């Protein structure tokens, strides 16, 4: 029977027993899926999530902002679910440092995400789930090779090191390109040319060659990177929803294809180097890695062989990480400088006083250019264009802040929240470079260390030092010689677009005027 409202007035005993059984089963499964919390520790707090979906809808278009908002309610350590996968979210500088630095061995893992298996054919040092001796040896090897062809000195050059030589050359070429564009059309989009110049720096270090800006091979590579960023920005639901791996998935297919093309490009460069390798003439990072497994054979610290495939993986990791971050930092900096001309003029006054106009900036000028350094740091902080680190995972049962976290738990580190924490910055929404200067005008080192962009601890980006140097020298060289502006009446859109790295909307109305004749 049904009531006047269309609702049942009673149910049978069989229906009642069946409903009770289903409820008990669901309750039992939910309880059984929760790990047993050791005595003295607490269960992770977190919001209620939708069945099957978890908190996917809660994250919205800006997950970094949504999770920062949740941290205000649940604290610096809480848990959400993506599908049926539990994810621990870390916020707050002290908590993040405790996890990644002081308890670094507990949190140095990577989750075994489905999409990660397609990066470098599963051989990625950055995305791979391995965190043991093999991974540590490869990381040391990559770090040594990177240092050899970046911060190490080049005896045949007047520059202090290979990196300085490459960046100075590319910055000069970039200025020439801007002049050509101004003469031809009177405005330009700086991003498309900055990315080519930065890509050339990492090409020179990894492959020993540079490309012209209209070279189709380099253009193809840069376009691949742009496509990769767009696809990665949408996330990979198949990482958390198993069924999506077996259904038609155009975004995942595109992601696989892009990774295949990146791998093929790098593999071909490595093969070329293998064919022309001479152990007495090490030309670049790729040669350095080939020498390691052909001549040195074993890593002296861990006795780990490095194969051809591993070499391709290391080079691809270094190459991929080597230009997107730097390009994004320079591009955002230029956007701030055209919208805040007072800051641009102040940097140029500092450059005129310290470097002058008779020579080009050097890495050695960096300590004497504190205001430029402060602007770079504020750009890193304000944009937080790397809102999260690559996800971590726990390598063993552990605890943080009194909360129990089991082995294998996926961990998100919200760098954006730290960089916009009012308790840390006071006025986080304001773009104010002076916050990074002491009363005497020096860089406040203690405060700069509170900005999170490159991660911390055992998974910290191995290219951080080089990336910071590149951003500094590109900007110093450009701003010494060029005054940037936008066409009159142009509205510059500074809204961050969420992604693997958060970009701004492209602006095609930049203008550049030489400050003096070379």
UniProtKB/Swiss-Prot annotation:
It is a peripheral membrane protein. Residues 33-44 are annotated as: Mitochondrial targeting signal. It comes from the Eukaryota. Belongs to the cytochrome P450 family. Glycans are attached at residue 71. The keyword Transmembrane helix does not apply. GO terms for biological process: amine metabolic process; estrogen metabolic process; hormone biosynthetic process; hydrogen peroxide biosynthetic process; lipid hydroxylation; long-chain fatty acid metabolic process; phenol-containing compound metabolic process; progesterone metabolic process. GO terms for cellular component: endoplasmic reticulum membrane; mitochondrial inner membrane. Its EC number is 1.14.14.1, 4.2.1.152. Pathway: Steroid hormone biosynthesis; Lipid metabolism; fatty acid metabolism; Cofactor metabolism; retinol metabolism. It is found in: Endoplasmic reticulum membrane; Mitochondrion inner membrane; Microsome membrane; Cytoplasm. It comes from Oryctolagus cuniculus. One of its GO terms (molecular function) is estrogen 2-hydroxylase activity. It catalyses: an organic molecule + reduced [NADPH--hemoprotein reductase] + O2 = an alcohol + oxidized [NADPH--hemoprotein reductase] + H2O + H(+); estrone + reduced [NADPH--hemoprotein reductase] + O2 = 2-hydroxyestrone + oxidized [NADPH--hemoprotein reductase] + H2O + H(+); estrone + reduced [NADPH--hemoprotein reductase] + O2 = 4-hydroxyestrone + oxidized [NADPH--hemoprotein reductase] + H2O + H(+); estrone + reduced [NADPH--hemoprotein reductase] + O2 = 6alpha-hydroxyestrone + oxidized [NADPH--hemoprotein reductase] + H2O + H(+). Coiled coil: none annotated. This is Cytochrome P450 1A1.
């Amino acid at each position: 029977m049904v009531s006047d409202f269309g609702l049942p007035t009673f149910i049978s005993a069989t229906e009642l027993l069946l409903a009770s059984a289903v409820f008990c089963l669901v309750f039992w499964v939910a309880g059984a899926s929760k790990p047993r919390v050791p005595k003295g520790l607490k269960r992770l707090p977190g919001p209620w999530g939708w069945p099957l979906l978890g908190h996917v809808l809660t994250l919205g278009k800006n997950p970094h902002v949504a999770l920062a908002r949740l941290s205000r309610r649940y604290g610096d350590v809480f848990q959400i679910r993506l599908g049926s996968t539990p994810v621990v979210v870390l916020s707050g500088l002290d908590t993040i440092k405790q996890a990644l630095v002081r308890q670094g061995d507990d949190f140095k893992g990577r989750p075994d995400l489905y999409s990660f298996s397609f990066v470098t054919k599963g051989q990625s040092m950055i995305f791979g789930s391995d965190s043991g001796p093999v991974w540590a040896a490869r990381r040391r090897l990559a770090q040594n090779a990177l240092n050899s062809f970046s911060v190490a000195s080049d005896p045949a050059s007047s520059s202090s090191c290979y990196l300085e030589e490459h960046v100075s050359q590319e910055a000069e070429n970039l200025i020439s390109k801007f002049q050509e564009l101004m003469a031809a059309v009177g405005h330009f989009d700086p991003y498309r040319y900055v990315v080519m110049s930065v890509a050339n720096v990492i090409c020179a270090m990894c492959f020993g060659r540079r490309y012209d800006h209209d070279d189709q091979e380099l253009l193809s590579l840069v376009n691949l990177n742009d496509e990769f960023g767009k696809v990665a920005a949408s996330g990979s639901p198949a990482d958390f929803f198993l069924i999506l791996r077996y259904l038609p998935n155009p975004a995942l297919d595109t992601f696989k294809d892009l990774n295949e093309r990146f791998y093929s490009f790098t593999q071909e460069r490595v093969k070329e180097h293998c064919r022309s390798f001479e152990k007495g003439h090490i030309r670049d990072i790729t040669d350095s890695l080939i020498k390691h497994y052909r001549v040195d054979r074993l890593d002296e610290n861990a006795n780990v062989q490095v194969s051809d495939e591993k070499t391709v993986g290391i080079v691809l990791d270094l190459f991929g990480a080597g230009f997107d971050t730097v390009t994004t930092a320079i591009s955002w900096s230029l956007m701030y400088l055209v919208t805040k001309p007072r800051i641009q003029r102040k940097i140029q006054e500092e450059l005129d006083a310290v470097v002058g106009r008779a020579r080009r900036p050097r890495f050695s000028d960096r300590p004497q250019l504190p205001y430029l350094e402060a602007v770079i740091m504020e750009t890193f902080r304000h944009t937080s264009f790397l809102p999260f680190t690559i996800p971590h995972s726990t390598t063993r049962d552990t605890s943080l802040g009194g909360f129990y976290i089991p082995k294998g738990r996926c961990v998100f580190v919200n760098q954006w929240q730290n960089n916009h924490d009012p308790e840390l910055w006071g006025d986080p929404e304001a773009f104010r470079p002076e916050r990074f200067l002491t009363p005497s005008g020096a860089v406040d080192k203690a405060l700069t260390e509170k900005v999170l962009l490159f991660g911390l601890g055992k998974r910290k980006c191995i290219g951080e030092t080089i990336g910071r140097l590149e951003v500094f020298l590109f900007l110093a060289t450009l701003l010494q010689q060029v005054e940037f502006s936008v066409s009159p009446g142009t509205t510059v859109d500074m809204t961050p677009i969420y992604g693997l790295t958060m970009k701004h909307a492209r602006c095609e109305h930049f203008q550049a005027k030489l400050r003096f004749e070379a």
